[in-house]
């Protein structure tokens, strides 16, 4: 099962310094095909070939386990309670493993604000995995982001940017 929303960004939103392009949740069962279909162009990938995105994505695994690879990080185990950050221009692949599949949330974003954090060394392609454990606060933030994305109300991009900042802050601090 997958629920997701892809968003349109306008030039004024970009001036805010951080925009959100996608937010969603998926449950992958043991017998399910991964990745699931229904992703917009540029998002679907073959787990053997991987992909390169033009944005950051922050994923949170709430159940299950998997494996992550990128150009700078090889064969990193993923487990429930992990947040992992995908970087623009960075080849990567990941998928669930084990007997249980997994449940995950994601949010895709880009902008000068996040680029500056990478340049300052707060976020790095060499350390894309953060173990934060189970967090009802993080789940609530992802659910709020999905709700706001569905509404597409005026200034929703600014609210979504605040949610991303909160998620990244929790990831960095926990």
Whereabouts are the PLM-identified features?
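Ligand-binding loop in jelly-roll beta-barrel domains
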Residues: 89-113
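Amphipathic alpha-helical segments enriched in hydrophobic/aromatic residues interleaved with Lys/Arg
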Residues: 116-174
